[in-house]
Amino acid sequence: MTKRALISVSDKSGIVDFAKELKNLGWDIISTGGTKVSLDDAGVETIAIDDVTGFPEMMDGRVKTLHPNIHGGLLARRDADSHLQAAKDNNIELIDLVVVNLYPFKETILRPDVTYDLAVENIDIGGPSMLRSAAKNHASVTVVVDPADYATVLGELADASQTTFKTRQRLAAKAFRHTAAYDALIAEYFTAQVGEAKPEKLTITYDLKQAMRYGENPQQDADFYQKALPTDYSIASAKQLNGKELSFNNIRDADAAIRIIRDFKASPTVVALKHMNPCGIGQADDIETAWDYAYEADPVSIFGGIVVLNREVDAATAGKMHPIFLEIIIAPSYSEEALAILTNKKKNLRILELPFDAQAASEVEAEYTGVVGGLLVQNQDVVAENPSDWQVVTDRQPTEQEATALEFAWKAIKYVKSNGIIITNDHMTLGLGAGQTNRVGSVKIAIEQAKDHLDGAVLASDAFFPFADNIEEIAAAGIKAIIQPGGSVRDQESIDAANKHGLTMIFTGVRHFRH
């Protein structure tokens, strides 16, 4: 009995050569629509789908393969006499191979001119149904959704006239992933269209971006997946201009870095980061000076770190960065001279180019945190804060310079691991206390790090001070201005301590925990 394949693809890469080889192996080919036209034009003889169904394509192609002559041919078990008899009684011929990929729904909704009606018309119905039928009956039917699998299938058919069960099972799993991801993307689109903030089912599609050597540690296996609907401002979308492949830890650190720099849009800014904590942030009228400040903030910790700049990297800035061992540099662009400097004898330095004009779109994405047996979902911490809404709770008002420095510090503290303390002036970070289990411990660490630069410095805390001992430590170090959320039942004790030492203190009313 001549074996039959059904081919209906939107991605026609390689399909003509594949179909020609099938014909050479003695297969009949059923096809539909544009695929049939392409194969016929290439001289590949095909059978029209309506010759199989006895029913014409209708409703602008919405109904063409949803027919017992198709699905019976796919689903009939070859080891079940009753199935084979039912097929014979109803003149259903068996189909042994299905090659289908689906209407380009993703590509359609990514078009800037897409309309709702166009998106709906690009939801495939018959394709997923055929794939699921073929995949369910993989004991006998081979299902192919990816042109990358054409060679394997043809090779096995040429060798043994059929594919192996192992291959059919693998391809069935791939087909089910394909249809599941397709439906998840449609669900994601419709959920957004109706503004459903808390859907009872969460379905998000990710595509494999990179198989990684290992994860956070060498004993951990890892991979990097990119959202099927990508954000341009993301490490997954960055263009790598130089260097080794990004590691698991590189990607996490780089992601943290590009989140921080989003809050410093107005002025040229450089962020240096290590282990997802900023070790230096510098802000100036030009990017070279901003680099100087970020480097001077902690010239020890920046070694082996990640640097992100929010302006084009020029030759002067590149010349200062080049002698330092850095893992990654990220910027919106690089001058030709800068790129030549940075890549000179630095073949491993990872240099990434990222479209900073897409930052706003990245801020609306939800954050996902895996826990054992579950997933936490939250909005990003991108609340708009207006300094005019902040409250000075002490007798002394901040000076103009202190106010500027406090705004800078408040932007920076949001990205320090809790319990987080940061000491800055109006243009650079000076000391950092991160990740301590008590707040006064973070205060002491930050003061120790900044001890030689405390003249005119200010301090920010990501959450309220639970006791006045924090204020006493700060005052003893000579720091005169504090910014914190407030909200402790002992706030008045902290206010009284600040007044006693002549400090100025602002309550923002917004906490910025970061775990």
UniProtKB/Swiss-Prot annotation:
SUPFAM superfamilies: Cytidine deaminase-like (SSF53927), Methylglyoxal synthase-like (SSF52335). GO terms for cellular component: cytosol. The keyword Hydrolase applies. GO terms for biological process: 'de novo' IMP biosynthetic process. Keywords: Hydrolase, Multifunctional enzyme, Purine biosynthesis, Transferase. CDD domains: IMPCH (cd01421). PROSITE patterns: MGS (PS51855). The IMP cyclohydrolase activity resides in the N-terminal region. This is Bifunctional purine biosynthesis protein PurH. It comes from Streptococcus agalactiae serotype Ia (strain ATCC 27591 / A909 / CDC SS700). The lineage of its organism: Bacteria, Bacillati, Bacillota, Bacilli, Lactobacillales. The gene is purH.
